[in-house]
Amino acid sequence: MDYLSLIKQPIEAELTDFIDLFNKSLMHSDGLLSQALDHIRQRAGKRMRPMLILLLAKNFGKVTEVTQHSAVGLELLHTASLVHDDVVDESSERRGQASVNATYNNKVAVLVGDYILSTALLHVSYSHSEEIVRYLAELGRVLSNGEILQLNSISNDEISEDIYYQVIKQKTAALFEACAGIGAMSAKASPLEVEEAKKFGQNLGIIFQIRDDIFDFYDSKEIGKPTGNDMTEGKLTLPVIYALKSTGDEDMLKLARKVKSREVTQDEIAQLVAFTKENGGIEYADKRMWDFHADAMSFLDTYVDDKNIYHALKAYLDFVIERKM
């Protein structure tokens, strides 16, 4: 059985209910808004975040309406953030399809993102849980702060792993942390169990982002985007940060600063990609992923008793670290 089938096995019925509720949340009678929402609904991914919420809820109790509305609210919040991110990053593509801003324009994309965000707040309110409502509201602030922190890090000359992890923990890892935490909260887990679930989610999110960053050093035919795309956007990720710090190569550091100032050429990016591969950057990032994997496994061994959920969450961890795209 493949990873995704293992992940879905304990929550197949609950996942179907989630998809129905989520799709209904993105329906509208207005022509333009309806078209834009249909466009977004058609690019549904693997549902990794909702599945994590459902699995954690089932681990600590059961999936309820509180769980489902919270899951829809969080996925809508994430969706809205992606629509807005594409405007900020001037991205023309999202999950292999034209982005909302590319299909329509920035004004429409911002308004559609705002509508989805409002719908997210509505669904979270249906949870009737002050704790979950507050957590989702705070998550929105954290994600926005993460974007600002990333913009600041690009314009800052400093190159460090600490800043790299600070950004991740307020972006990708914050989302996974919230999924695990909200799943546990919705099942009325104890405060300790909720905190441990959050740590598990954060580890998952860090692994997810490092894997994404490793993909950026390989051919576009393998991963569906240009090699060195992050550097084109002014971002220095873990593999190249390690290679720069471990070698102290001044010529490469000069190129790295050109990346951050958006003055780098494609040939210079290719040099940095080759330099990173030749100096252990990929191997180091891979090792760090497995370190976070080990931390995440300790949660499963301590807090997950049901063997089907254990296998599903183990498959989830393994999928995130071993995925090919």
Task: Describe each region flagged by the PLM.
Residues 1-325:
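All-alpha prenyltransferase/terpene-synthase fold signal
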